């Protein structure tokens, strides 16, 4: 698959596969860098960050290594269940990467992205010593806080594309479906809850982050990894589906209703009597914080200095086909919703990509693998302001979690005896 000459004067072509099979494809990095430099930088951050969280988990011991493995498996299930098991709900396509799995649909860095998000959130929340009822909700919202700059900036730089007309992701925030934030809040909270609730049932007398017998840890890991996604889906049922599907309420409203409910539980937990954190920060703790700083600053630098219109994605995207052909989705309440089965390449509403870098030539019907081109910022200053605001909030939140809930032990004063 080759693309026409791009606006930077070089040929935008598919990455040359070094190794190619359905399970894993290894692509030439130089081709990918030429097409999408910000994507390569983003991937490197999550690969390194995922390995750092693993090293941190091993250094902490106890249940943290089990938790890390559980997150990894939970992410694989959550990111691929819809593509493989329920393809009618398949609604996003990653750009190609140096190492990508499952027929070119699962990049390596996405596997490690989930530990970067959820592990960092859970470890930061653990320092607050919140009551058990508040912890999953806090982990959910902190996961969203880590995710937001990634979601907003990466899609603008065509690191992936969304389905154009899927009703579940139709309502957007800077081209990010509001349900993406809802997804991260509910799936991470569900996984965290099941990981600990299962172990509390199997070994009720063992402290939360202390490892029990291998059977208890194995079953809690398997149950949370396999069922965390389904718990997250269930949390869509009481709020999102009735309000959005039955009453046509915008997904922004349903997300902020979820946010309000989470916040109430978290606030009650914060105002409860709870012990201060007595653990001193280790070198690995500071590495986690450094990794978060790099994560946030990378996306700030992208919107400040980089140009999305120079990013070109050659690979799998939404299949192109007849503009009027529909397919149906059935909601948990039995309603039938409809979406276009194919991308109508001559009439679509995803303004973060177009076909200008290939001379405006749209892909023919039947295309699944084709070239798309990033588009310029409509207002770069607005993106800079939004990401800056998120960075300010994240700085305050993580500083408070790590440094403001610490028990201060006064220095021991030794009185001298008078002779």
Regions found by a protein language model. Name each.
Residues 1-419:
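Aromatic-rich, lipid-facing transmembrane alpha helices and their immediate juxtamembrane interface loops
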């Amino acid at each position: 698959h080759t693309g026409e000459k791009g606006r930077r004067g070089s040929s935008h072509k598919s990455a040359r596969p070094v190794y190619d099979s359905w399970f894993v494809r290894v692509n030439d990095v130089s081709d990918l860098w030429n097409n999408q430099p910000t994507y390569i930088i983003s991937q490197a951050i999550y690969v390194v960050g995922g390995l750092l969280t693993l090293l941190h988990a091993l250094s902490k011991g106890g249940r943290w290594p089990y938790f890390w493995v559980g997150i990894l498996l939970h992410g694989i299930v959550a990111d691929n269940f819809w593509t493989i098991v329920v393809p009618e709900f398949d609604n996003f396509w990653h750009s190609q990467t140096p190492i990508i799995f499952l027929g070119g649909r699962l990049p390596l860095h996405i596997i490690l992205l989930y530990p970067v998000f959820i592990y960092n959130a859970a470890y930061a929340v653990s320092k607050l010593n919140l009551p058990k009822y508040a912890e999953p909700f806090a982990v959910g919202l902190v996961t969203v806080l880590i995710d937001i700059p990634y979601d907003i900036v990466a899609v603008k730089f065509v690191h992936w594309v969304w389905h154009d007309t899927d009703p579940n992701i139709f309502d957007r925030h800077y081209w990010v479906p509001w349900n993406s934030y809802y997804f991260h809040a509910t799936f991470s909270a569900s996984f965290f809850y099941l990981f600990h609730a299962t172990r509390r049932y199997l070994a009720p007398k063992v402290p939360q982050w202390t490892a029990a017998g291998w059977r208890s840890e194995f079953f809690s890991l398997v149950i949370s990894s396999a069922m965390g996604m389904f718990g997250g889906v269930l949390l869509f049922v009481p709020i999102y589906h009735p309000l959005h599907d039955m009453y046509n309420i915008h997904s922004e409203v349903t997300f902020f209703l979820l946010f309000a409910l989470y916040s109430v539980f978290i606030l009650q937990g914060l105002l409860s009597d709870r012990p201060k954190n007595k653990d001193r920060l280790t070198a690995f703790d500071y590495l986690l914080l450094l990794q978060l700083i790099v994560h946030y600053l990378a996306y700030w630098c992208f919107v400040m200095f980089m140009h999305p219109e120079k990013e070109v994605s050659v690979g799998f995207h939404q299949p192109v086909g007849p503009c009027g052909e529909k397919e149906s989705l059935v909601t948990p309440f039995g309603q039938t919703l409809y979406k276009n089965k194919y991308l109508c390449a001559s009439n679509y509403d995803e303004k973060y990509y177009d076909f200008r870098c290939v001379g405006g030539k749209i892909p023919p019907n039947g295309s699944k693998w084709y070239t798309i081109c990033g588009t310029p910022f409509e207002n770069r200053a607005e993106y800079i302001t939004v990401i800056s605001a998120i960075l300010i909030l994240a700085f305050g939140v993580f500083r408070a979690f790590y440094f403001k809930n610490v028990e201060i032990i006064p220095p021991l004063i030794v009185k001298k005896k008078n002779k």
